[in-house]
């Protein structure tokens, strides 16, 4: 996706600020205000630069702020072009260089462990994976082998019907047009034994954005480009829409 000096998009990303990176980007199709957190998903061919933090889908939801309920706002494809032939020094403080694929794998494993600690209070399920299964899981992620990946992923997850026993659901909420991410600690059930809804969780953690538990008034919750109804059971949503790192990433879109 790009010429020999262009970039190859992958599902890994890093970030910097637009105002400090202006000279490195010759074409950003999305209108981004100065200073907005820019999440880039790229690998520059000549310099073999790999970068990682956010998946490109999450980046799109978070940074465009587009309302999925309005089809006229969809922008596809989302094109980011990295200028790699500048005379000035590469901005290594903003766009991280990843030396090897093993570095990416190690980061992903770390995220899996972090999610496991949130669910179980420890990382034993991930640590107990055999080397063969760990490598097989990674290879399937790289090759987009959905069936193989989730056949192993399900072995380190509590069964969905046992979700009530989960210590807390691994959830990260991203505030609109900012660099703030909230790692929410959310129990799958309320104190009275009822299943927690996404509306209850967002109202509890972000009452300014969600003054109501049942109706979006100020912002909408978006996962994988789809608006999530606030009455959705959070545990069910987690099992249906978690990312390959074991987290459910929720971005907020402001209501105009």
UniProtKB/Swiss-Prot annotation:
Keywords: Autophagy, Isopeptide bond, Membrane, Protein transport, Transport, Ubl conjugation. It comes from the Eukaryota. There is a cross-link at residue 113 (Glycyl lysine isopeptide (Lys-Gly) (interchain with G-Cter in ATG12)). One of its GO terms (cellular component) is phagophore assembly site membrane. The keyword Ubl conjugation applies. It is a peripheral membrane protein. This is Autophagy protein 5. It comes from Yarrowia lipolytica (strain CLIB 122 / E 150) (Yeast). The lineage of its organism: Eukaryota, Fungi, Dikarya, Ascomycota, Saccharomycotina. The gene is ATG5.
